[in-house]
Amino acid sequence: MASSGGQIGGVLDHHVQRAVCDSRAKYREGRRPRAVKVYTINLESWYLLIQGVPAVGAMKELVERFALYGTIEQYNALDEYPAEDFTEVYLIKFLNLQSARIAKRKMDEQSFFGGLLHVCYAPEFETVEETRKKLRERNAYVARMTKNKDHYMTKKHKDAKDFRGAFHSKTSGFPAASLNTSTGNSDLCLPYSSELPLCYFSPKCKCSSGERVDRPSNSSQDGRNFDETLGRCDHCDSLQKMQMKTLQNSLARPGTQKALTPSEAVDRFMPRTTQLQERKRRREDDCKRETLAEACTSSKEVMIGPQLPGIPKVDTHDGSWNTTASLIREKLKEVISSVPKPPEDKVEDVHRSRPLKQRRRI
């Protein structure tokens, strides 16, 4: 085993338990008080050093407890490591680095046979090949995560660009469609009818973000007409902005807004007593339908469709046995046919005498 920064068996700096951080803000404190420690890949390791294990021969229980968090490759006790009286120190190597991380986080400062465990990483027990393997795995993980992030960002920009292109292509014919009637506006998912054209005044007036109005060259025209033209231009510009915003919202959220039908609106604002009466009426209708269906099935009605195969007659090759079997069949038919059937009015009375219990509203 290779050591990097200290003699094996001696207490190293990263093996010492740090004090609890007292300067942490209240909103950052967890359930248990902890110290502030940042672990990089060179400080993490498959090897975990467990200190504070009571010297009662509980190595089997300790290994079983740590095996809950991952596969353990090897474990052994460190007799030469300095420890407190009546305690032992164990070294456990996990097969995966993530298992070692979880085991350290879960088992650190946990009670075990009356003692408090202290779990820390022990990268000094790694060989050169194990360290290289750990660094290669970390590099592969970083490359994979950055690649996924770049792919996600590229896809996000591409989707935004495609949405802009689709939006511009759909809004390119928007002014022409606004000249049509409300039937044309229903294709654009507009909530109102815009039968009037966007600019129903002089073609010299342009209603856009860079608003410009050319005064007519005729000096005899008064200022009132010019003010009316400006007012119309402002009105059309605001109307066009409202239509563009409505179209953008409808394209951004397709299918999310659904108009309520008149029946749904009426059901929503129906009083509670009326709703209960309506439910009671529906239950009674269901009971009547079930009774009618039972009566129809019980009546001898000719059914159109493929007939089921009849019961095959068993031939016992003995006349006496065949006679006995036929007598038994006839007797069974008489017994079945002699069962009285309740009339239909009694069936309805039974259903009415036992009404369905309504569910109480809490």
Swiss-Prot record:
Residues 334-362 are annotated as: Disordered. InterPro entries: RBD_domain_sf, RBM48, RBM48_RRM. Component of the minor spliceosome. Within this complex, interacts with ARMC7 and PRPF8/PRP8. Keywords: mRNA processing, mRNA splicing, RNA-binding, Spliceosome. The lineage of its organism: Eukaryota, Metazoa, Chordata, Craniata, Vertebrata. Residues 353-362 have a biased composition (Basic residues). As a component of the minor spliceosome, involved in the splicing of U12-type introns in pre-mRNAs. Belongs to the RBM48 family. The gene is RBM48. This is RNA-binding protein 48. Residues 46-124 form the RRM domain. One of its GO terms (cellular component) is spliceosomal complex. Residues 342-352 have a biased composition (Basic and acidic residues). GO terms for molecular function: RNA binding. One of its GO terms (biological process) is mRNA processing.
